[in-house]
Amino acid sequence: MYEAQYLWLFGLVLISGSVTERTTPKINFTTVVGLKTTPAMRSSSASSLGGSLPMVINTWNFTDANFLAWRILNVTQGGLRQTRNAVVEGCTRCEQQQCDRTVGYGGSPDELGETTLDAMIMDGSSMDVGAVAGLRGIKDAIRVARHVLEHTKHSMLVGDLASQFAQAMGFRSESLATPESKAMWMEWTAANCQPNFWRNVHPDPSISCGPYKPKATPLTRWKEDRARTEYSIGHLNHDTIGMIAIDAENNIHAGTSSNGARHKIPGRVGDSPIPGAGAYADNEVGAAVATGDGDIMMRFLPTLLAVEAMRAGKKPAEAAEVGIRRISKHYKDFSGAVIAVDRLGQYGAACYGMTEFPFVVSNPSKTDIPSRQESVKCITGKEAVNVV
């Protein structure tokens, strides 16, 4: 009798569609659909058709960082509670390897020849953030950001005082300069400091070094040159590793690390350590990371836009396009990319100002190919007219 009642009740649950996510078998399958395999898909984005957890995904072709994060994520069965370790140590690997000289020490010297670091880690369960910006003399930027998250009630520390905090937490102070970064700076100064980030100053920043002073022209008569083609973003000039890790229980962390824009004005901070700009995570929805022209991208909070677009029902690939299209409406010459992932492990990417954008993914769908490289072709100027 009781057995018949249980069978009847189970059948009713199935018919009503109220079976919980935990009782639904997970589909171990992820295909980044290339632009050539699905005609209906725009050439601006790529997306998985099914979720697959746990997973790690990061910007650019930084496979070693992804592989380490993937190993850490699977230290315990299902990667449970390992997402923070995975993201922090994955990005740390890139800092140590000086990935393309755009992450970590010894790259992207500012106008004075100094390398400074920006990094962030965000917890999608608590919405807590730890970040550092303009970090001087400390190599472990994202580990310091983790200490901000775990040992303070703040969200961000900056500059020399961030470095003092790091030393108090046990981090070693050392020079971030290398022979390569010094040579990079010397070549730049020998070329009359070209290109640079100055405008509306004298002497003319397009042909000479500073020091500069503001023009006396009234503000209403200033002509702003918004073109940034001198700083086209791509291989060897893309600034940031952004990484997302999700475990089998849908716990999410997202993080970034960068040494910023090459030859930046000292004191400049880009999008990488800014929540909603460089990265954003919310366990209820998913996460997103961004890379590219940070000075422009941070004005639009593209990773927050992507997560909120997924909350509103858009698929990850569509959500990644939201911020990209919003930015390209105002800045035709910007270059950048966004990766979006929902809480089930479905992912997508969109980019602009480049031919294509590579990224790296690890998940259970292809255990024989961990840290596999995938790419997406970018939105063109004509496609970007259709702003979301």
From Swiss-Prot:
The active site is at residue 240. GO terms for cellular component: lysosome. Substrate binds at residues 268-271, 291-294. It catalyses: N(4)-(beta-N-acetyl-D-glucosaminyl)-L-asparagine + H2O = N-acetyl-beta-D-glucosaminylamine + L-aspartate + H(+). Cleaved into an alpha and beta chain by autocatalysis; this activates the enzyme. The N-terminal residue of the beta subunit is responsible for the nucleophile hydrolase activity. Its EC number is 3.5.1.26. Pfam families: Asparaginase_2. GO terms for biological process: protein deglycosylation; proteolysis. Keywords: Autocatalytic cleavage, Disulfide bond, Hydrolase, Protease, Signal. Residues 1-20 form the signal peptide. It is an enzyme of class 3 (hydrolase). Disulfide bonds join 94-99, 193-209, 351-378. It comes from the Eukaryota. GO terms for molecular function: N4-(beta-N-acetylglucosaminyl)-L-asparaginase activity; peptidase activity. Gene3D superfamilies: (Glycosyl)asparaginase. Cleaves the GlcNAc-Asn bond which joins oligosaccharides to the peptide of asparagine-linked glycoproteins. Heterotetramer of two alpha and two beta chains arranged as a dimer of alpha/beta heterodimers. Belongs to the Ntn-hydrolase family. PANTHER family: L-ASPARAGINASE, N(4)-(BETA-N-ACETYLGLUCOSAMINYL)-L-ASPARAGINASE. This is Putative N(4)-(beta-N-acetylglucosaminyl)-L-asparaginase GA14866.
